[in-house]
Amino acid sequence: MKLTIFALVACFFILQIAAFPLEEAATAEEIEQGEHIRVKRVTCDILSVEAKGVKLNDAACAAHCLFRGRSGGYCNGKRVCVCR
């Protein structure tokens, strides 16, 4: 019983120490200045797959463009999504 209580108290203190914020953490202003990376090729590179004879070549790009209010889209030679 004493070992169980000791283990619970030790876990509590370890979790409390881990929950403290780091003093070196970046502020919101530092993050906004240039930490964002925008990859425009993700719909054409990663989501253009073929599985069991079904090809989803430009379907993700077309769905992305339809979601943005365009009439569709395609992947160009550089594998970048181009909306119509």
Swiss-Prot record:
Swiss-Prot/TrEMBL keywords: Antibiotic, Antimicrobial, Cleavage on pair of basic residues, Defensin, Disulfide bond, Immunity, Innate immunity, Secreted, Signal
Pfam families hit by this protein: Defensin_2
Superkingdom field: Eukaryota
UniProt GO BP: defense response to bacterium; humoral immune response; innate immune response
An example Gene Ontology CC term for this record: extracellular space
Extent of the signal sequence: 1-19
Record family assignment: Belongs to the invertebrate defensin family. Type 1 subfamily.
Function: Bactericidal protein produced in response to injury. It is cytotoxic to Gram-positive bacteria.
PANTHER family: DEFENSIN (PTHR13645:SF0)
Protein's UniProt name: Tenecin-1
Organism encoding this protein: Tenebrio molitor
